[in-house]
């Protein structure tokens, strides 16, 4: 009944107008699973490879016809007829078929599209929501949203060097209330920026991208918006940063072009520690560059006891890199992006290793997204307690929040909002 009878890949557009892969998997009993693959702007050097066509005469070289051909050809030939409930086996077959360490031949975008669509088809066949199918009966924790309301770095055309300034409504009683708090702060921030003469255009992830001179200026605007919206910073709502430090790490130092400053590793650690001391910041992602392991260790020793330090480019959702981080006590949390590793099985293994080792996990979108809301279900399935899926604008972002609202409603009295517990000692 759950045998795979057809797989159809196609090229669709993501939220940036670039092509991406969408896959339909049809089972013998008529169940159809559909998944669309996201794409990142600031990508880690150690990520699985997203296969692009490179034909400059079509979509400026960003077409994904080769990946789609792999889905409809080689991949279907290899897994057609297999049982969709055998997720680990199906993912292993595709990884072996690819034959490279980073999925470069068939493309992580091809493999992931099939992997997620298989899980969705199996869930439908079992008449279960995806979060329940993947996570079992204990999947009932709604994550704290990390809402990216000011954008900088590679996500915006402004001088701010850090990529994201986030609010976390961890003090809310439910996910729905937390979302409302975030929306109210977002609109209050918009008015504050406008009144101060800044533009209120939004970046790739729906956050504002004002021309502010420094991280402190952005944090001050966010703090004011939290207070003006009627909430208490450091009690109701907390702050988070994604420095995306790899993007401005050159020749062994951190070059803040927007501020016109260069900070060596010691100065970078000192600066981040100072920000944590001055603001209610409970989480910093990629505060150091992806291969600056010594810097990461220094940062962890300096503020790891009082701040969540999330490895994105550092760990790239990869079990081996996370294993090294755990061994060296580097960072204390991992950002989980399904397309960084390229299959559902490997994603779940990474989250499991993190949780087993006392590291937190944050389910995450990419800057190039679609209307696909799979990561909302995966956040609940893995009970990871935190989700990062952009701002309170753009339907490619709100699609995930809306799915979490549905899940919370469906779970009813069983639903549990992670709240401050997700941040342990930090909040």
From Swiss-Prot:
PROSITE patterns: ENOLASE
A GO term, aspect molecular function: phosphopyruvate hydratase activity
Cofactor binding: number and manner: Binds a second Mg(2+) ion via substrate during catalysis.
Disulphide bridges, residue numbers: none
Alphabetical list of InterPro entries matching this protein: Enolase, Enolase-like_C_sf, Enolase-like_N, Enolase_C, Enolase_CS, Enolase_N
Keyword Glycoprotein on entry: no
Active-site residue list: 205 (proton donor), 337 (proton acceptor)
Name of this protein: Enolase
Gene name of this polypeptide: eno
């Amino acid at each position: 009944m759950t045998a795979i009878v057809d797989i159809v890949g196609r090229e669709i557009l993501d939220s940036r107008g670039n092509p991406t892969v969408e896959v339909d998997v049809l089972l013998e009993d008529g169940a159809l699973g559909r998944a669309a693959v996201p794409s990142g702007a600031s990508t880690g050097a150690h990520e699985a490879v997203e296969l692009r066509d490179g034909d400059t005469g079509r979509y400026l070289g960003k077409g994904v016809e080769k990946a789609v051909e792999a889905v409809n050809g080689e991949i279907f030939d290899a897994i057609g007829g297999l049982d969709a409930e055998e997720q680990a086996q199906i993912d292993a077959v595709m990884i072996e078929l690819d034959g490279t360490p980073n999925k470069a031949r068939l493309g992580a975008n091809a493999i992931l599209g099939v992997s997620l669509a298989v899980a969705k088809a199996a869930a439908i066949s079992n008449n279960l929501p995806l979060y329940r199918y993947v996570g079992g009966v204990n999947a009932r924790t709604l994550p704290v949203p990390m809402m990216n309301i000011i954008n900088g770095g590679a996500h915006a055309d402004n001088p701010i060097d850090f990529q994201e300034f986030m609010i976390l409504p961890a003090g809310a009683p439910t996910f729905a209330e937390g979302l409302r708090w975030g929306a109210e702060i977002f609109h209050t921030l918009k008015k504050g920026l406008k009144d101060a003469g800044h533009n209120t255009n939004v970046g790739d992830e729906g956050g504002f991208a004002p021309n502010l001179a420094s991280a402190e200026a952005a944090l001050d605007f966010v703090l004011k918006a939290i207070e003006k919206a009627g909430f208490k910073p450091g009690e109701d709502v907390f702050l988070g940063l994604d420095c995306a430090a790899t993007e401005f790490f050159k020749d062994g130092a951190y070059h803040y072009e927007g501020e016109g400053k260069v900070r060596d590793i010691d100065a970078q650690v000192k600066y981040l520690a100072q920000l944590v001391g001055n603001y209610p910041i409970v989480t910093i992602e990629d505060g150091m560059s992806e291969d600056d392991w010594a810097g990461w260790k220094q940062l962890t020793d300096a503020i790891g006891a009082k701040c969540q330090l999330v490895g994105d480019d550092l760990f790239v959702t990869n079990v081996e890199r996370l294993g090294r981080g755990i061994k060296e006590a580097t960072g204390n949390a991992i950002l989980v992006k399904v397309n960084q590793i390229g299959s559902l099985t490997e994603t779940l293994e990474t989250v499991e290793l993190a949780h087993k080792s006392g590291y937190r996990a944050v389910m995450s979108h990419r800057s190039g997204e679609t209307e696909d809301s799979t990561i909302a279900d995966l956040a609940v399935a893995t009970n990871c307690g935190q989700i990062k899926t952009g701002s309170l604008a753009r339907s490619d972002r709100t699609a995930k929040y809306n799915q979490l609202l549905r899940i919370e409603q469906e779970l009813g009295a069983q639903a549990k909002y992670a709240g401050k517990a997700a941040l342990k000692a930090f909040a």
